[in-house]
Regions:
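Inter-lobe coupling/hinge segments of SF2-like helicase ATPases
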Residues: 1-151
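C-terminal or mid-to-C-terminal helical accessory/interaction module adjacent to the motor/catalytic core
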Residues: 20-23, 155-184
Length: 184
């Protein structure tokens, strides 16, 4: 995966890496079980990628909801211009980001995201005629719902089909009450 990222960058393209957590302090109960790895965080993944041999010399930026607005603008400008062609981020990039040179997205611990989020994230790549790829990875054992969600995501890029799949998987919810699907 990281060699592929290096190939894209060598061709003048941009790469997103999306994580469900900002840093280790965001861990809730996902790493309490013995032997279960904590969910990927922007801070840890960026540090790992900066030391990865395939990405030697590649400028890597981090972007999260905690990043100050002025710095966010500079980070996105650097990413768009190719000065920092690899961006490790949370879902803060989900909407309002248009970088036509972005051709690869790696979503880590993809089971943590909903179908709509995954679809919005994938929409950040493939915004030009360049071939693009979105890789949704998971390192944890999947629940039946998580597996179904990722299978639906992998099966189509059609937003309407994904919305229908999401409705089938999560149901319509309790529109008059407080019951919801998912975890908080």
């Amino acid at each position: 995966t990281w060699a592929r990222a290096a190939e894209e960058i060598a061709q003048g393209r941009r790469v997103y890496v999306v994580c469900p957590r900002i840093d280790a302090s965001d861990e809730v109960a996902d790493a309490e079980e013995e032997g279960v790895r904590p969910l990927a965080s922007v801070e840890q993944v960026a540090a790992y990628l900066r030391s990865h041999p395939a990405l030697a010399g590649v400028a890597i930026h981090e972007l999260t909801g905690r990043t100050p607005s002025a710095l966010k603008a500079q980070i996105m400008e650097d990413f768009s211009a190719g000065r920092a062609p690899l961006l490790v981020a949370t879902t803060v990039i989900e909407v309002g980001v248009d970088v036509s040179e972005a051709t690869l997205m790696v979503i880590l611990d993809a089971q943590q995201f909903g179908l709509a989020q995954l679809h919005q994230l994938r929409g950040r790549v493939g915004r030009s005629s360049l071939p693009s790829l979105c890789i949704a990875m998971h390192r944890h054992e999947l629940t039946d719902a998580g597996r179904a969600r990722l299978q639906a995501f992998a099966s189509t890029t059609d937003g309407f089909e994904l919305a229908e799949a999401d409705l089938r998987l999560r149901k319509e919810g309790d529109v008059l009450g407080a019951g919801q699907s998912g975890t908080a």
